[in-house]
């Protein structure tokens, strides 16, 4: 069906976004052993001293409970219902409600050997602790740290590694060489433009490493511009989605929950997608108005690519890229 009016466009885009299978690129949760459930979820909500909870995390928590058909008005009963699930079944229900295609759950490099997941949609995101590159008496032994990364990736089957604390020397002498040797994709948080500059220098110096970079709103425009000319770089954008659509088309990641609980992940996705689809509508509207043959099928394909298709395509091609 060719779309020619704004209301049809809005309805089509909203439906495509709500039905899309999504890739979660950062879940801060021990999927193998971490505590989850209604009790943990409600404990995470900031108390409002009897007033209406208006915090974003409260909205996400209640959105998750609603999606899981848990009674929001009766927390003890919701906890009782949840207790009837096995851990595996409860996690599977969360992923099903989210329409999760893949979830990258953090696995500390120190726990890699024991990381086992009960659902094959969960993938390990090998995570380097902030003190991993803390210098000892003789400085930092980068070769030893690189070998630890390679061994941990092999132990848990990780193809992705996250460095939370930017360190240009660590990237140059350890992380990027380890990614090259073990065919890992690098996830990196960048908090300043100087860090982004340093990271881009290291990425350009490597001819094979693929990366997913993200940062706060002030860094996002720089990362978007960088990704426009670098096929090995994907950026995750939370605030500057209209700019990313303009500069990158659909080749970026528009969301990550960075949640501490699976239920938070579900709820944050439900609330985030309601902010994403209007931005997509605004991007499509000029095409619809000028007579471009925009169809609902094309929009569904676009949305699926945006919410994980490009990321998984890069994931599938990573090993081939390292062999080029």
List PLM regions with ranges.
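Generic detector of bulky aromatic hydrophobic side chains
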Residues: 218-219, 234
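Active-site cradle of extracellular carbohydrate-active enzymes
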Residues: 172-206, 210-214, 220
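Metal-cofactor-binding active-site regions of metalloenzymes
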Residues: 2-182, 204-208, 224-324
């Amino acid at each position: 069906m060719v779309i020619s009016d704004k209301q049809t466009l809005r309805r089509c885009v909203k439906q495509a976004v709500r039905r899309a299978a999504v890739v979660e690129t950062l879940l801060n949760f021990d999927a193998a052993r971490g505590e989850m459930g209604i009790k943990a979820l409600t404990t995470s909500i900031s108390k409002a001293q009897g007033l209406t909870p208006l915090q974003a995390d409260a909205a996400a928590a209640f959105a998750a409970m609603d999606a899981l058909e848990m009674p929001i008005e009766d927390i003890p009963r919701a906890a009782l219902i949840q207790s009837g699930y096995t851990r595996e079944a409860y996690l599977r229900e969360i992923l099903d409600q989210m329409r999760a295609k893949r979830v990258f759950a953090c696995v500390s490099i120190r726990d890699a050997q024991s990381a086992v997941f009960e659902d094959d949609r969960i993938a390990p995101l090998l995570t380097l602790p902030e003190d991993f590159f803390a210098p000892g008496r003789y400085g930092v032994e980068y070769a030893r740290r690189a070998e630890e990364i390679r061994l941990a990736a092999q132990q848990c089957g990780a193809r992705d590694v996250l460095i939370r604390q930017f360190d240009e020397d660590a990237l140059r002498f350890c992380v990027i060489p380890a990614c090259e040797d073990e065919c890992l994709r690098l996830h990196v948080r960048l908090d300043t433009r100087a860090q982004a500059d340093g990271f881009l220098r290291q990425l350009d110096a490597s001819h094979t490493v693929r990366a997913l970079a993200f940062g706060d709103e002030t860094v996002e425009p720089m990362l978007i511009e960088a990704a426009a000319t670098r096929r090995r770089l994907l950026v995750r954008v939370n605030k500057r989605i209209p700019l990313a659509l303009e500069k990158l088309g659909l080749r970026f990641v528009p969301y990550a929950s960075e949640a501490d609980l699976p239920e938070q992940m579900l709820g944050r996705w439900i609330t985030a997608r309601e902010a994403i689809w209007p931005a997509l509508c605004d991007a499509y509207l000029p095409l619809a108005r000028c007579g471009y043959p925009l169809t609902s099928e094309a929009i569904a394909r676009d949305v699926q690519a945006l919410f994980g298709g490009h990321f998984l395509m890069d994931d599938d091609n990573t090993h081939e890229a390292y062999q080029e």
